[in-house]
């Protein structure tokens, strides 16, 4: 089988490419150039967009003994991921750019191009497992290493994409992968994992948004108000710098009368008003999801679990499909859930699909 191995310059994608080659596949490595200005990223930045990362990927391909190329998808990435990220925050929502990248870039633009060039599959270093289902469908399950499981950010993939995907690391732990990399002589064996949003080099999301959005945001400045009294507690430089559940960086002039910390409860991008209050008012019992993406069979109703953050806990939930939208009832409350986040649905370890949260039903305890 002809396999295109996406190599970020990190240890996971390098070992995934090596395993694909060792399995007898005809493997070609590629590095995705996603930044329009990679020189702006400092050496050692914990992302995958630096020139250093590209060089690390090339050296790994040389060690493995596979051809290697760089594909420039920077314009497509900027349009589909970066611009979407800015627009979502400007609208008061909290997007996950990693899911967007998987949906629009790695398993769409890259996969489509790979298939057009005669490749049979794309291999990545994601931690997830693919197994053959009894109904002939390809099922995606959580990885063996639950601490590194990345099935959440892959919950946007459908059958057409899963059938042409390989995740060679799904049955391994991270420690095993690092040991194997060292044994194979891969210089990235001890390279730190990337955690930050790859196109925000210093990790300062609010500062980056302020610089990039500028006057494009509906309200550059606004007020921070108390949920109980409506009193103005402070001002801010842009509602796009906040997310639901945020506690730090509010810069409120005085503490609450009861001394408890305040959290962001609501963001109104049109007026620029950010409402804050106690933690218990973040409790969410019901979600509305739009743009569902199904990994296989489309359920009308499902009792399973839902994950609401990339490394968040699972919540027992009941899903009811309503046309092109879904209603998700949480059997226990979740806290700090924001519109724009992804709700990824599971039946045991199997990924059922995902939806973008459009609304939440908060039960305000007063």
Swiss-Prot record:
It is found in: Cytoplasm. Catalyzes the 2-thiolation of uridine at the wobble position (U34) of tRNA, leading to the formation of s(2)U34. It catalyses: S-sulfanyl-L-cysteinyl-[protein] + uridine(34) in tRNA + AH2 + ATP = 2-thiouridine(34) in tRNA + L-cysteinyl-[protein] + A + AMP + diphosphate + H(+). CDD domains: MnmA_TRMU-like (cd01998). It comes from the Bacteria. InterPro entries: MnmA-like, MnmA-like_C, MnmA-like_central, MnmA-like_central_sf, Rossmann-like_a/b/a_fold. ATP binds at residues 6-13, 32, 125. Its main location: cytoplasm. HAMAP family: tRNA_thiouridyl_MnmA. The gene is mnmA. The active site is at 101 (nucleophile), 198 (cysteine persulfide intermediate). GO terms for molecular function: ATP binding; tRNA binding; tRNA-uridine 2-sulfurtransferase activity. This is tRNA-specific 2-thiouridylase MnmA. Disulfide bonds join 101-198. GO terms for biological process: tRNA wobble position uridine thiolation. It is an enzyme of class 2 (transferase). It comes from Nocardioides sp. (strain ATCC BAA-499 / JS614). Its EC number is 2.8.1.13. Keywords: ATP-binding, Cytoplasm, Disulfide bond, Nucleotide-binding, RNA-binding, Transferase, tRNA processing, tRNA-binding. Belongs to the MnmA/TRMU family. Residues 148-150 are annotated as: Interaction with tRNA. SUPFAM superfamilies: Adenine nucleotide alpha hydrolases-like. It holds the Pfam family tRNA_Me_trans_C. The record marks 126, 341 as: Interaction with tRNA. GO terms for cellular component: cytoplasm.
